[in-house]
Curated annotation (Swiss-Prot):
Upper classification of the organism: Bacteria, Pseudomonadati, Pseudomonadota, Gammaproteobacteria, Enterobacterales
Gene designation per UniProt: outL
Name of the protein described by the UniProt record: Type II secretion system protein L
Keywords of this entry: Cell inner membrane, Cell membrane, Membrane, Protein transport, Transmembrane, Transmembrane helix, Transport
Location within or outside the cell: Cell inner membrane
GO biological process terms on file: protein secretion by the type II secretion system
Keyword Transmembrane helix part of the UniProt annotation: yes
Protein's membrane topology: Single-pass membrane protein
Cytoplasmic face of the membrane: 1-273
Length: 425
C-alpha cells in the first residue's frame, strides 16, 4: 500500500502561527467493484483542493492508515456506479409523503429482480420529476459492512459518477483508472470500462456535448468510432475523481442511505448513553404529575362534598325551594329579606351555629325546621342512625343554645328525635 507522507513532514517543519485556526482535513474513500478488490482513499485539505495523503489496499491495510486521521471535516464514500441503476420517475406531490413505499411499485414492471431484494433511494426531485437509484440490498449491506470494518463515520455514501459536475446541455465525463464515468443532465450516471466506452457512446448516438475532465479525447483511444462533430467532445480543466468528490457541493438527498439504511442522527447517538437516565427522569415526572393530579382530584372531591352538604342543609332549612344553585348567595338573600322585617340579626346569630352543627354531623338529617321569632328558638325534627348520634348532636348544640330535648324513638333502622334550640342570650 502506498501512502504519501509529504504533508506530515511539512507540518513538522512549519509551526502554526499564533491565532491560526486549525482546520480538519476531509476523507474520500472509494470502495471496489469486487468484494476483495483494493479500497482507494485520499485525505485532502478542508477545501478539498490539496492532497495531503493517499493510499490503497485491503481493509486490513487501510484501516490503520485511516486511524491516523481521527478528526476530519467530512467523510464521503464512493461506490461503483456500475452497481447502481438509475430511473426517472414522475412523483406527484401527494405521493412524496410515502415515497419509500410508492417508488418500488412504480418501478416494479421495469425491474428484473424482485423488489423485496432491492433498495430504492430518491437522489433528487425537480418539480414532479425525480431520479431514483436502485441497488441490490446485499450490495448495500456489503458496502456498509466495509465502512464499519474501516471504522468510518460516513457523512455521505453515493455513486462515484454522481460527483461529476452537472451540465444542462450535455454529459460530464471522467476517466478513473480503467473506467469511464458519465453523468447526464437528468441526474443519471453511467460507467464503463475503457474497452467498452466507445461502444457505449456509439449506442447512445446522437450524442449531446460531452464535457471531459480527463486528458483522453476523441483523438485518442476513441478515435476508431465515428463522431458527428469534433466539437462534441469538450475538454475541461483536467482533474481527478477524488478532487471532484472532495470539492462537490452535495445535497443531503444524494446519500444512498435512505429508508431502512438511513443513518442515526448525531443527536440520537449523543443521547443514547443517557437513555436510561431519561427514562428514569420521565418516570419520575410521570409520578409527580400523577401525584399532583390525585391530590387535585381529592381536593375537588372534598370541595364537592362540602358544596353538596351546603345544598343539603339549605334544602332542609328551606324545603320548599327546589332550585339550589348557590346556597350561600341564596341564604344571604333570605337573611336580607328577614332583616327588612327587623329580626334578621337575631336569626343570623342563631342560624350560623346550627349550620356548623349540621356540617359537623353529616349523618343527621333535618326532617323539619321551624323558627319562632318571638321566642327566639328553633324547633327541629331530626333523624339519625343511632341514639348516640342524636345525643352527641345535643351535647354539641349545648355550647351554642339552651337545648330542650324532646321525644326520641326508634323507627325501623333510624332514630328520630325532637329538639328545641333557644338562644343563650
Amino acid at each position: 500500500m502506498k501512502i504519501a507522507g509529504k504533508w506530515k513532514r511539512k507540518a513538522a517543519k512549519a509551526p502554526l502561527h499564533r491565532g491560526t485556526v486549525a482546520r480538519h482535513p476531509c476523507l474520500i474513500v472509494r470502495l471496489p467493484v469486487e468484494e476483495q478488490g483494493e479500497i482507494e482513499w485520499q485525505v485532502r485539505s478542508s477545501n478539498g483542493e490539496s492532497l495531503l495523503s493517499q493510499g490503497r489496499g485491503s481493509i486490513e491495510q487501510v484501516r490503520p492508515a485511516l486511524a491516523a486521521y481521527p478528526s476530519v471535516t467530512f467523510t464521503r464514500v464512493l461506490v461503483p456506479a456500475t452497481d447502481v441503476t438509475f430511473y426517472a420517475l414522475t412523483l406527484p406531490r401527494q405521493a412524496r409523503r410515502h415515497v419509500t413505499q410508492v417508488v418500488p411499485f412504480m418501478l416494479e414492471d421495469q425491474l428484473a429482480t424482485e423488489i423485496e431484494k432491492l433498495h430504492f433511494a430518491v437522489l433528487e426531485i425537480h418539480g414532479d420529476d425525480g431520479t431514483v437509484a436502485v441497488v441490490e440490498k446485499n450490495r448495500m449491506q456489503r458496502w456498509l459492512a466495509q465502512c464499519d470494518a474501516l471504522g468510518l463515520s460516513v457523512d455521505t455514501l453515493l455513486p462515484d459518477a454522481r460527483v461529476l459536475p452537472k451540465h444542462q446541455d450535455g454529459w460530464s465525463a471522467l476517466q478513473h483508472d480503467d473506467m469511464w464515468l458519465f453523468r447526464q443532465p437528468t441526474g443519471h450516471a453511467m460507467a464503463a470500462e475503457s474497452s467498452w466506452c466507445g461502444d457505449l457512446l456509439k449506442a447512445s448516438m446522437p450524442l449531446p456535448a460531452i464535457y471531459s475532465y480527463s486528458a483522453a479525447s476523441v483523438g485518442g483511444e476513441l478515435a476508431q468510432y465515428e463522431w458527428q462533430e469534433e466539437g462534441e467532445w469538450k475538454a475541461q480543466p483536467e482533474t481527478d475523481l477524488f478532487t471532484l468528490a472532495a470539492t462537490a457541493h452535495l445535497p443531503a438527498s444524494v446519500d444512498l442511505r435512505q429508508g431502512d439504511y438511513a443513518p442515526d442522527k448525531a443527536w440520537q447517538n449523543t443521547l443514547l448513553p443517557w437513555r436510561g437516565v431519561g427514562i428514569a427522569f420521565a418516570c419520575y415526572l410521570l409520578l409527580v404529575v400523577a401525584d399532583a393530579g390525585w391530590a387535585h382530584y381529592q381536593l375537588y372531591q372534598q370541595a364537592e362534598h362540602w358544596r353538596q352538604e351546603s345544598v343539603r342543609v339549605y334544602r332542609q332549612i328551606f324545603p320548599s325551594e327546589t332550585n339550589v344553585v348557590n346556597p350561600r348567595a341564596q341564604m344571604q338573600q333570605h337573611l336580607q329579606r328577614t332583616a327588612a322585617g327587623g329580626a334578621g340579626k337575631a336569626l343570623l346569630d342563631q342560624l350560623t351555629p346550627l349550620q356548623q352543627l349540621m356540617t359537623q354531623n353529616s349523618a343527621i338529617k333535618i326532617q323539619s325546621l321551624s323558627y319562632d321569632g318571638a321566642a327566639g328558638e328553633f324547633r327541629l325534627a331530626l333523624q339519625g342512625t343511632s341514639y348516640q348520634e342524636l345525643e352527641q348532636f345535643q351535647q354539641q348544640a349545648a355550647a351554642y343554645y339552651q337545648v330542650q330535648a324532646g321525644e326520641m324513638r326508634q323507627e325501623n333502622d333510624r332514630v328520630e328525635g325532637r329538639l328545641t334550640l333557644r338562644s343563650q342570650q
